[in-house]
Amino acid sequence: MDSILVKGNGELRGQIPIAGAKNACLALMPATLLSDEPLTLTNAPRLSDIRTMTQLLQSLGAEVASLQGGQVLALSSHALTDHRADYDIVRKMRASILVLGPMLARDGHAVVSLPGGCAIGARPVDLHLKALEAMGAELDLRDGYIHAKAPAGGLKGARVVFPLVSVGATENALMAATLAKGTTVLENAAREPEIVDLARCLRRMGAQIEGEGSSTITIEGVDRLGGATHPVVTDRIELGTYMLAPAICGGEVELLGGRIELVGAFCEKLDAAGISVEETERGLRVARKNGRVKAVDVMTEPFPGFPTDLQAQMMALLCTAEGTSVLEERIFENRFMHAPELIRMGARIEVHGGTATVTGVEKLRGAPVMATDLRASVSLILAGLAAEGETIVSRVYHLDRGYERVEEKLSACGAQIRRIPG
């Protein structure tokens, strides 16, 4: 099993290209199931989760070709051979549930295993299922599988009110509604850029959608969808992660492809901590203003609030801030599993339920640490960049699910980091 060796060595300077968004691409790929015409995705990230979704779609009979080194995906679902998404593939990734809505909408039936993925508390699929039931689907959960069937004549437009904001449930309902009979209104819908990106792609395919980016999305069902070519939106979580690298280490880094509107709430916290963020012709330039970072309080919220997927990385920054910071996690439970590993490096962190209190220290110390999930793994790498001595991060298979060539991108800016094959 691979590990990452990091040596803290001061400032970073250079440029880092930001890839297409993993979470956007994982929703865009199942959209091919809505049409029998080709869908081409450009600016696709080259990640293990994308390969897992490729395997899942191919198991259903879809064709998926990876072109230009994986940056272009050519998909076609003109002849599905199966409507059963098996546990062996689905268990690897929670986004697998996103094949349910498209298959149900196009062909009227689907069998999908309950999903797996990151070990971050309870992430139930109830909201997905209730949305589809509102459109008339009959659902039966047995033997670890969701057995879904559309009513005669197909899914029907409906008013769907999400009791909680859910990106995945919004995506599943949005895709299903494009082929439903009549009008569907999604209320308390997720507003994330990945939702906007999916809606734009579906519109290119012929869907009639209004309101994406707001909490109310209206979809007028159509008889069929066609093909399209669509660029995947920039990955705002990768962007935010690499913005934190010069914030932690000092120096100045330009993030190519970065856009301020993708990370607005995050940038506000960086500014309060003493980090400069400037727009450039090619992206964003980030630098630490003067001296030690200042403590700030952070509360995770659905977009446009502070993203939960940047909470672990932000904690790494605040470990060496001047003063005491409070981080409140309001999206997922059990999402401070990185805290004990940061404590091994000398951080002062107290966790009580969904709140972590971080008292900044002047310096972290390198140590062997273990990644527990995707975002925790990169937070430990960031901490290692600012620590004295060597840090070895084990179980970095988590990292490869969401970050493309992390050691190459950081080393290009002067970081001493390398992968140790396991």
UniProtKB/Swiss-Prot annotation:
Biochemical pathway:
Cell wall biogenesis; peptidoglycan biosynthesis
Q: Which residues carry this modification: 2-(S-cysteinyl)pyruvic acid O-phosphothioketal?
A: C118
Question: What's its EC?
Answer: 2.5.1.7
Q: Which GO terms describe its molecular function?
A: UDP-N-acetylglucosamine 1-carboxyvinyltransferase activity
Keyword vocabulary terms for this entry? Cell cycle, Cell division, Cell shape, Cell wall biogenesis/degradation, Cytoplasm, Peptidoglycan synthesis, Pyruvate, Transferase
**Highest taxon of the source?**
Bacteria
Alphabetized InterPro entries for the sequence = Enolpyruvate_Tfrase_dom, Enolpyruvate_Tfrase_sf, MurA_subfamily, RNA3'P_cycl/enolpyr_Trfase_a/b, UDP_GlcNAc_COvinyl_MurA
Query: Which amino acid positions bind UDP-N-acetyl-alpha-D-glucosamine, per UniProt?
Result: R94, R123, P124, V125, D126, L127, D309, I331
Instruction: State where it is primarily located.
Output: cytoplasm
The subcellular location is: Cytoplasm
Provide the disulphide bond pattern.
none
A cellular component annotation (GO) from this entry: cytoplasm
Q: Which CDD domains match?
A: UdpNAET
Question: Pfam families attached here?
Answer: EPSP_synthase
- Give the catalysed reaction(s), semicolon-separated: phosphoenolpyruvate + UDP-N-acetyl-alpha-D-glucosamine = UDP-N-acetyl-3-O-(1-carboxyvinyl)-alpha-D-glucosamine + phosphate
Q: Which Gene3D superfamilies match?
A: Enolpyruvate transferase domain
Q: What GO biological process, any one, is recorded here?
A: UDP-N-acetylgalactosamine biosynthetic process
The enzyme's main class, written as a single word, is: transferase
Residues the record lists as binding phosphoenolpyruvate: K22, N23
Active site (record annotation): C118 (proton donor)
Tell me where the transmembrane regions lie: none
According to its UniProt entry, what is the function of this protein? Cell wall formation. Adds enolpyruvyl to UDP-N-acetylglucosamine.
Q: Which family does it belong to?
A: Belongs to the EPSP synthase family. MurA subfamily.
Q: This protein is called what? A: UDP-N-acetylglucosamine 1-carboxyvinyltransferase
Specify the species: Cereibacter sphaeroides (strain KD131 / KCTC 12085) (Rhodobacter sphaeroides)
